[in-house]
């Protein structure tokens, strides 16, 4: 295996996007379409429990992989 160089230019990597592209955060009021139904408390509770379960599984998977492959040294790329 070898090093993988980024396909972005240094300027794009520093900015984090394409030239002329602007990022902005969207609030919950702006993201909701007019007339769209609101999520009820049951749905919000389900979504919260599901997201917590996903995070727990991801951490368990990371811990297992770290335990299994943690002794393999990381080799950084020295290529220009």
From Swiss-Prot:
Subcellular location: Cell membrane
Disulfide bridge partners, by residue number: none
PTM entry text: May be palmitoylated at Cys-3.
Organism this protein belongs to: Tetraodon nigroviridis (Spotted green pufferfish)
Main localisation: membrane
One cellular-component annotation, GO: plasma membrane
Record's keyword annotation contains Membrane: yes
InterPro entries: Small_membr_AKAP (IPR027969)
Protein name, as recorded: Small membrane A-kinase anchor protein
GO molecular function list: protein kinase A regulatory subunit binding
Pfam families tied to this protein: SmAKAP (PF15127)
């Amino acid at each position: 295996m070898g090093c993988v160089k980024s396909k972005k230019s240094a300027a794009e990597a520093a900015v984090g996007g394409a030239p002329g592209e602007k990022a902005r955060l969207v609030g919950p009021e702006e993201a909701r379409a007019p007339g769209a139904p609101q999520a009820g408390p049951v749905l919000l509770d389900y979504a919260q429990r599901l997201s917590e379960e996903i995070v727990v599984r991801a951490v368990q998977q990371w811990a297992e992989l770290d335990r299994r492959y943690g002794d393999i040294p990381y080799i950084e790329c020295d290529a220009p």
